């Protein structure tokens, strides 16, 4: 099986990106959305990305998108321009193939060229695999927001993991 290639997402990838995101919702581990989102709703989110400073990357094997990573501005104020939140999602049938690790590793390598000095990851406190992934790259817990999310009546903590990259 060919190794997927990393590239900037194009608009034609958006349905696959949304499908991967929606596949994470029922597990209540990776997103605070409780219902599937529509492609049309995510179009403005897609348009906020740009390859020069806030890319949206996909890992593609031919026409199949197996995983994606997003850089998003933190807090939307100019003083935070050198800080970005990264989010990574992998299609369920491609979990445990190292794709999230590959994407996070690339984000760390390329962040300085994007003008970034700090990367953040917002992760539920019960999402042990994601916490381990980011800690494996040297991210530290910078904040714990206790019981801020209610997922099916269960209150969950939100951790903010951070790493200086430049």
Task: Show the residue positions of the predicted features.
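Acetyl-CoA-dependent GNAT
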Residues: 8, 35-93, 104-105, 164-165
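Glycine-rich acetyl-CoA-binding "A-motif" of GNAT/NAT acetyltransferases
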Residues: 64-68, 129, 155
């Amino acid at each position: 099986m060919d190794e997927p290639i990393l590239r900037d997402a194009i608009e034609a990838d958006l349905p696959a990106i949304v499908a991967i995101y929606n596949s994470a919702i029922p597990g209540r581990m990776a997103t605070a959305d409780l219902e599937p989102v529509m492609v049309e709703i995510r179009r403005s989110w897609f348009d906020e990305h740009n390859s020069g400073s806030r890319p949206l990357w996909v890992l593609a094997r031919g026409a199949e998108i197996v995983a994606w990573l997003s850089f998003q501005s933190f807090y939307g104020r100019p003083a935070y321009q050198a800080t970005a939140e990264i989010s990574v999602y992998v299609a369920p049938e491609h979990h445990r193939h190292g794709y999230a690790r590959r994407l996070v590793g690339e984000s760390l390598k390329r962040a300085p060229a994007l003008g970034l000095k700090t990367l953040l990851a917002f992760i539920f406190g019960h999402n042990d695999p994601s916490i381990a992934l980011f800690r494996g790259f040297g991210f530290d817990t910078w904040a714990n927001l206790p019981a801020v999310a209610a997922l099916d009546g269960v209150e969950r903590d939100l951790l903010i993991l951070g790493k200086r990259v430049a």
